[in-house]
């Protein structure tokens, strides 16, 4: 059991992190949305960032409400909020993976004809790919929705005589729900890993090819991109692992360590959100023009 003062401290840290992420997400959507209305078109990277901003905005509010309901044992409200959090969490993972795929397709120097064909097709169909990620999320959330319904049924049966066979089946399906959610996160994470490794290999190859003993502007740009990619890789991998541990939920007494753990998790999410803000040329150009 941790002291109440420490619990309050980490609760405040978590709330401040969450509000910062919400403000960042709102800023991304507002700035890029305004640009979209003015020029009537956006680059694919900005389409992803707007989608990510909306998804992360909803995810963060769902997370805050979910955690406070969990802490104060509001179980019926918690069940309804959990499915919302899971939906936007899976969608956020897919959108992050698509962003990395876009950078890999756009910036890598591979010249194989299959890769060039994929680049042409993906860039041409990017709005439909975004819609596809939303549809995949809707499909993968179905087991969680069923598990959420089962959880509510288990809560209503808590004070009633139970049929042990039925209860065991319900609890087994509830465990399957967590496995399905884990798989739904692992697939886009593998896509992220593959795209990141390919892009890092391509950038390293370009640096070695253009190395002439002195640092020209092209070399500096490649070094900067490689460094940014390495930071994004570390932050997103840490984010994935912390979310995975949160889903498994077997490490800590959830009520006792809730705010310590959430403050730790959302520190990574805040770093990732900040790095995404800095990845959009359009966003950086507009914000610099306002200063």
UniProtKB/Swiss-Prot annotation:
TM region(s), chain numbering: 2-22, 42-62, 85-105, 126-146, 183-203, 229-249, 258-278
All ranges on the Extracellular side of the membrane: 1, 63-84, 147-182, 250-257
Cytoplasmic topological segments: 23-41, 106-125, 204-228, 279-291
Location in or out of the cell: Cell membrane
InterPro entries: TAS2R
Superkingdom of origin organism: Eukaryota
Entry keyword annotation includes Phosphoprotein: no
Keyword Phosphoprotein: no
Residue positions with a glycan: 80, 163
Membrane topology note: Multi-pass membrane protein
Principal place of residence: membrane
Similarity field: Belongs to the G-protein coupled receptor T2R family.
Note: Most taste cells may be activated by a limited number of bitter compounds; individual taste cells can discriminate among bitter stimuli.
Subunit and interaction comment: Interacts with RTP3 and RTP4.
Name of the featured protein: Taste receptor type 2 member 16
Gene giving rise to this polypeptide: TAS2R16
């Amino acid at each position: 059991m941790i002291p109440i003062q420490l619990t309050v401290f980490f609760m405040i840290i978590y709330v401040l992190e969450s509000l910062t992420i919400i403000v960042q997400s709102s800023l991304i959507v507002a700035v890029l949305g305004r640009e979209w209305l003015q020029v009537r078109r956006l680059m694919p990277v900005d389409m992803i960032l707007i989608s990510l901003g909306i998804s992360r905005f909803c995810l963060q509010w769902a997370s805050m409400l979910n955690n406070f309901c969990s802490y104060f044992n509001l179980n019926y409200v918690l069940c309804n909020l959990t499915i919302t959090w899971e939906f936007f969490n899976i969608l956020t993972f897919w959108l992050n993976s698509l962003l990395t795929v876009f950078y890999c397709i756009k910036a890598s120097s591979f010249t194989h004809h299959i890769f060039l064909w994929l680049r042409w097709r993906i860039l041409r169909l990017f709005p439909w790919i975004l819609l596809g990620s939303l549809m995949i999320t809707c499909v993968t959330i179905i087991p969680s929705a069923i598990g959420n319904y089962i959880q509510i049924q288990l809560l209503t049966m808590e004070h009633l005589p139970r049929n042990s066979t039925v209860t065991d089946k319900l609890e087994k399906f509830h465990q399957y729900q967590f496995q399905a959610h884990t798989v739904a996160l692992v697939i886009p994470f593998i896509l992220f890993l593959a795209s990141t490794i390919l892009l890092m290999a391509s950038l390293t190859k370009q640096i070695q090819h253009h190395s002439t003993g002195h640092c020209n502007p092209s070399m500096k740009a490649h070094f900067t991109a490689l460094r940014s990619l390495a930071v994004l890789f570390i932050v997103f991998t840490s984010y994935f692992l912390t979310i995975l541990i949160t889903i498994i939920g077997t490490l800590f007494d959830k009520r006792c360590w809730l705010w310590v753990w959430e403050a730790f998790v959302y520190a990574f999410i805040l770093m990732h959100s900040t790095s995404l803000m800095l990845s959009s040329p359009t966003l950086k150009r507009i914000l610099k023009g306002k200063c």
